[in-house]
Amino acid sequence: MGTPELKIILEFSAGAELLFGNIKRRELTLDGNQKWTISNLLKWMHANILTERPELFLQEDTVRPGILVLINDTDWELLGELDYELQPNDNVLFISTLHGG
């Protein structure tokens, strides 16, 4: 048997995609041997796929105010925010509410 995998979908909307190489949807296969929380995922994203101005996406160890996070269409605040443990086929959507004038 191979290494267990955790497959999830990341989506970026309303300008958040500009920080990730203008890619709006990304299917990820993560190492299923480890526990993946949103906190771990954000660190992985910063190290691997965040291409532009990380200060517009992250503030310390979390997303900055103005970035909405939905997990399977549910506000992450209802699911434990950074402590939420990712499940197979989760859809994590990041929506930027930060817009210039």
Swiss-Prot record:
1-thioglycine modifications at: 101
UniProt subcellular location: Cytoplasm
Pathway(s) where this gene product acts: tRNA modification; 5-methoxycarbonylmethyl-2-thiouridine-tRNA biosynthesis
Function: Acts as a sulfur carrier required for 2-thiolation of mcm(5)S(2)U at tRNA wobble positions of cytosolic tRNA(Lys), tRNA(Glu) and tRNA(Gln). Serves as sulfur donor in tRNA 2-thiolation reaction by being thiocarboxylated (-COSH) at its C-terminus by MOCS3. The sulfur is then transferred to tRNA to form 2-thiolation of mcm(5)S(2)U. Also acts as a ubiquitin-like protein (UBL) that is covalently conjugated via an isopeptide bond to lysine residues of target proteins such as Prx2/Jafrac1, Ciao1, Eip71CD and GILT1.
PTM: C-terminal thiocarboxylation occurs in 2 steps, it is first acyl-adenylated (-COAMP) via the hesA/moeB/thiF part of the MOCS3 homolog, then thiocarboxylated (-COSH) via the rhodanese domain of the MOCS3 homolog.
GO terms, biological process: negative regulation of JNK cascade; protein urmylation; tRNA thio-modification; tRNA wobble uridine modification
Subunit note: Interacts with cer.
Major place of residence: cytoplasm
Top-level taxon: Eukaryota
Protein family per UniProt: Belongs to the URM1 family.
One term under GO cellular component: cytosol
Keyword terms, alphabetized: Cytoplasm, Isopeptide bond, tRNA processing, Ubl conjugation pathway
Designated name of the protein: Ubiquitin-related modifier 1 homolog
Glycyl lysine isopeptide (Gly-Lys) (interchain with K-? in acceptor proteins) cross-link site: 101
Organism, scientific name: Drosophila simulans
Pfam families cross-referenced by the UniProt entry: Urm1
